[in-house]
Amino acid sequence: MEISKPKGSTWTDDQWKAIVSSGRDILVAAAAGSGKTAVLVERIIRKITDQERPVDVDRLLVVTFTNASAAEMKHRIGEALEKELAENPGSLHLRRQLALLNKASISTLHSFCLQVIRKYYYLIDVDPAFRIADQTEGELLGDEVLDELFEEEYKKGNPAFFELVDRYTTDRHDLDLQHLVKRVYEFSRSHPDPEGWLHSLAELYDAASDTKVEALPFYSYIKEDIALVLEGMRQKLTRALDLTKQPGGPAPRAENFLDDLAQIDRLIQQQDDFSALHELVPTVSFQRLKPCKGDEYDPRLVDEAADLRNSAKKQLEKLKSDYFSRTPEQHLESLREMKPVIQTLVQLVLEYGRRFAEAKKEKAIVDFSDLEHDCLAILSVKNPAGEAVPSEAAKFYRHQFHEVLVDEYQDTNLVQEAILKLVAKEEHEGNLFMVGDVKQSIYRFRLAEPLLFLSKYKRFTDDGSGSGQKIDLNKNFRSRSDILDSTNFLFKQLMGEKVGEVEYDEQAELKLGASYPPNEATKTELLLIETPSGAPGEEAEELEAVQLEARAMAGQIRRLITEKFQVYDAKAKASRNIQYRDIVVLLRSMPWAPQIMDEFKQQGIPVYANLSTGYFEATEVSVTLSLLKIIDNAYQDIPLASVLRSPVVGLDENELSLIRIKDKKAPFYEAMKAYLAAADGDERLSEKLRRFDGLLKKWRAYAKNHSVAELIWEIYRDTKYLDYVGGMPGGKQRQANLRALYDRARSYEATSFRGLFRFLRFIERMQERGDDLGTARALSEQEDVVRLMTIHSSKGLEFPVVFTAGLGRNFNMMDLNKSYLLDKELGFGTKFIHPKWRISYPTLPLIAMKKKLRRELLSEELRVLYVALTRAKEKLYLVGTAKDKEKLLADWRTQAAGSEWLLPDYERFQAKSYLDFIGPALMRHRDMDESGAPPVIDEIREHPARFQVSWLSAADLQAEAVDQAGEERHDRLVQIQMGHAIEGAFEYEQQVRERLAWSYPYKDAAKVRTKQSVSEMKRQKEYEDEYGDRSLIRPSQEALLFKRPSFMMAKGLTAAERGTAMHTVMQHIPLTRTPEKNELSRLLDRLVEKELLTEDQRAAIEEDDILAFFDTEIGQKLFGARRVEREVPFNMTLSAKEVYPDLESADEPVLIQGIIDCLFETEDGFYLLDYKTDRIHGKYRNGFEGAEPILRKRYETQIQLYARAVETMIKMPLKGRALYFFDGGHVLLF
């Protein structure tokens, strides 16, 4: 029985249905911005708080896609429970739920798998102390296992293995075959039964002598592709024929086009018969077009018709080269010849998998793939028919979980689906609740399988009468109507069953759910930039495109900010001016991000991007890694030269040349040794090299007995490189980078690997895989900046204004050009490779997979575009570059022809970029009428979507309009750089001379500090006395490597540290009576406990010196004082003339700061007392008598300033001023 929606509820009917429906498996197709997370949380809360049948939270399995999503889910549930508890404070059930929440199964599926394995490890013979391996550690272990396997196979001399090697390796190495083995193994792990899938691979190549191509298991994809191409050709030729009937059309060529159509129709009639097509396709010939000359023919229509025909001819040639360049028998023979090779490959992969699993077991490690498969092994057993059925462990979980709820179900893979089926109840019991949006399935590269979602969506019914219930949430509560209308307009034309994998029908369309105040400026804008043709190379074109797009976006952003574009603030329930933080730029991938950031910064636009790159390129990291490489093996020229040229050794190019000249052919290390052995070398250079070579030998010996992390730290200590980089620009970040390398080494030591060589290989694998620790960011995500991010990173987020850039960039289809392809359904497709002649060509399975995977990749790209467009709340910009505007528009017109909403499958299948999708769709909109839009049905033309299309040229996008004066300044700068005379310069000659002769009138004031401490003034006076000038900083001598600063070389406590310790004791000692020695010792111990003194300072204190102070006359005065103030701070302003008497024009005020050790008041007045720890005995010839005049002179300025400050504060003269010297117990009165 369904629960009726309460009156006043803000949930839509469909949302309410998703919240309360039960008793069957439920699939919720939640469109972008439809509130799916809120619905999921509400469903969970209602189950927990149900008055009649409440469910404990730990009896729900909630599976999320990321750890962050799981944490957010727990947080939301916790908040909802606390709110319920506030309304029902006496509820023990709610208190219990809050207590259970932390251990509830709300996590990623990997985390749930880990939980299952920890509980049932004994069922699959796994070490209970296992840990999850680092990805790089797993790869290195796999490499070792594979190397050992290949070495054994070579020793065996197995002919089948050698044939495999001959076909899949080069004459230099067998790395290609090793990569193939690992790739097939890893791909097999995406299947619930990896071994079964591997054994099926060779079946694809079963081709008996009587087999027909049409009977092969993959032929349906070839047949579909042939039909698609032929239909596309037919549509192009039909369109060309239609053009002949238009006024000004190429009427004489109608006969040509009719003949072409007749030939294509014959092919279409035979498209199910591969052999017949093989005979017919070569017979098709396109006759020479009849001439169309004269004013009666429209050149545009003539050219368009010819282009359509040429396009059809090219497609026919492609069809020939793909399928019909070889006979059907030759195709079948290739399969027969490759079958035993595939079988050998499968056996090799199986053996690798067995050994890899054994190696991981020995080291008690698992990887993420193992988590899923080990969990699957625990939850399933094979029945007599060999089918996987729930084990006792699975039955436990089926009983344990009242409901299994899966978020982002569209991103589930086949193994995860198998696990979910085992822990959920059977379909007729229905406790599986799945939420997702297949239109946002963008993780196929992680082997997600959107077809799982689609198959259920097609199978389930609205009322749940079948095997499950489907519920559509298509009301969007995020975006304005302009965003929704433009998205719907595009995707109704682009997303279909064949390209897109889902029909964008009425159920899939986004419906308006949000309420915004009116704003006429929110129509979707398409910014198209026409780039000059003929740019030198693809890389130059790419660079130019990103700069132009960045410049166009910067201009629009400035306009939005300047014109105070209004965005709606939901919290304030009012509109406000746009801020930079409201804007995001979305990219398919991040290679363009640095250039866009640079351009934005030049235009004064604050920008932020989470760039996780640049760490290994950082100079300090590169130098340290080079140093580690030559410690491992000094005979590596590039790393060695890098270290010698770096600040670690500090050679310049001339010095490197001198070394190389000693031995021009030997490795550089040998040349270095030759230079050291030579008697005629430069002494300074030789000394540098000797010291470095000595350190290199020391480090090599050190590396044998210490960890890599210890070695790195030893290098930092010996070279002082960590300290050195701290003084460079960005020093803190550079030091953090070096510490990160040390931390990376420590984490490496925590793996199953050891040693420097393996660590370097470990780092190389990280770099090969594109892993990067990244560099710290100067701007946080909370600041008012424009964000740059990938479309994948933006999933689940929303922004008031979205720029989707790079729409003209070609899709990455490089994987389709490999010599082999893998597919979960079809298996393994490979080129035929002749072992002797090295001739290769694609087999039919490879061609079939290429067509299938291309369609899947295009479908994924469409979904990525959908995600990008649906991030926008109020304003959407689409930005792209194109080369030839007129040609592009003509192509779009051709592709846009047709009366159906959905653009032809064939045209969409040819798309190479997002613009190839968007352009033809936009050509059918009324806003494109001026571009010669093709005739379409009124429903399309009158769609409510609003677009504004702007074509910009490169000239329009110069970095702010350059005025005439700016051009003149630029020309003069060029003349100066070239050494040419500047015309008209005499006009400014006098002004130039006056400016060059000008002298700053306040040079003396620049030497004056505006704030100075008393101690600094005392030291300044000492330097004046001893050296007669104020040069407190003197140049240091050049040193090899980096000399440790004197303060870092000090052993024990410095004089200043001892003085600080004595002052601390005098600040805290009780002043009621002379303390006993044991009392003083206890006081010192307490100061150490309170961390006011260190152990070293405690040990340095002479207790007798402190006790002797209280035997003096001034010490006794303290006991009878009315008031005692210790550590008295003061500020006082003096004229600069008093502080710097030698300066002529120094009349600026100077702030003087100081701290008085002790100020006390007796019956006869105030006394100032300062403690000194200067060494006297053993330093001065006549003891204190000889020291007194020197000490009096040294501290006279300080005491005078202290006295002046105190007398100003107390407004009366001091009775006495004294210094007490602990060394000897002497008092100096002033």
Swiss-Prot record:
Q: Which cofactor does it need?
A: Mg(2+)
List, in alphabetical order, the Gene Ontology terms for molecular function in this entry.
3'-5' DNA helicase activity; 3'-5' exonuclease activity; ATP binding; ATP hydrolysis activity; double-stranded DNA binding
Gene Ontology CC: cytosol; DNA helicase complex
Q: Which residues form the UvrD-like helicase C-terminal domain?
A: 507-796
The EC number of this protein is 3.1.-.-, 5.6.2.4
Kindly give the Gene3D superfamilies that the UniProt entry links to this protein. 3.90.320.10, P-loop containing nucleotide triphosphate hydrolases (3.40.50.300)
Report the record's disulfide bonds: none
Official protein name in the record? ATP-dependent helicase/nuclease subunit A
